[in-house]
Design a protein with these regions (language model features):
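Glycine-rich, Lys/Arg-enriched anion-binding loops that position phosphate/diphosphate groups
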Residues: 118-199
Length: 199
């Protein structure tokens, strides 16, 4: 279990992110933390309190922020955003190493890229539409946590889909390997199954 997972799972765990207008990056980061610990307290604000000792993301220029000059970039050129930085730290604990990489490639990276470059992404647009209108009388926190709730459902379903596909692949592989047919046929079937966990 990673150090961050242990910190997130603490009974009095807390996290801090920026206030104001929100994006898919900070929303899915929050949903990920809540997936790991539904009781974690997430606070939004314009600056990180000096005495804050919890997890800080998408603000503060720390480990899980990407707004500094030396922000990290993946080997394939896709820059990390907060969601990607958090996923890198906890993904293997949630899905295992192999599926965590696939999930990063197919789900996390498009959102990170949208946040960093503005490249169009329908899911990011959907989440962004939860931001209240200019003349909304209330604050943005209520809308933010509504968006986090939706993002949480998406994450849960995605995780289960990945796990389900992996279980199906393993089951089919077991059946194929038990067949008395030739090795070539078995190899062809196994090769055709590779990558089916990508969703």
């Amino acid at each position: 279990m990673s150090r961050l997972i242990e910190q997130i799972k603490q009974k009095d765990a807390c996290a801090f992110t920026h206030g104001g207008k929100f994006h898919a990056d900070d929303v899915f980061s929050s949903a990920l933390l809540l997936y790991i610990n539904p009781e974690i307290s997430i606070t939004r604000g314009n600056s990180v309190p000096d005495d804050f000792t919890g997890i800080v993301f998408d603000i503060g220029r720390g480990e899980f922020d990407h707004h500094q000059k030396d922000s990290r970039i993946r080997e394939n050129g896709v820059p990390y955003a907060a969601f990607g930085l958090l996923w890198e730290a906890v993904g293997a604990d949630i899905l295992g190493e192999e599926l965590a990489v696939k999930f990063d490639e197919s789900f996390v990276q498009p959102l990170d890229n949208n946040d960093n470059t503005g490249e169009k992404n329908e899911l990011a647009t959907l989440i962004g539409n939860f931001n209240p209108s200019w003349d909304y009388e209330g604050g943005s926190d209520e809308a933010f946590f509504q968006a986090v709730s939706v993002a949480g459902m998406i994450l849960e379903n995605k995780f289960e889909r990945y796990r389900g596909n992996e279980r199906a692949d393993k089951r089919v592989e077991e059946v194929v390997l038990a067949l008395p047919s030739s090795r070539c046929i078995r190899c062809a079937i196994c090769l055709s199954l590779s990558g089916t966990s990508k969703e």
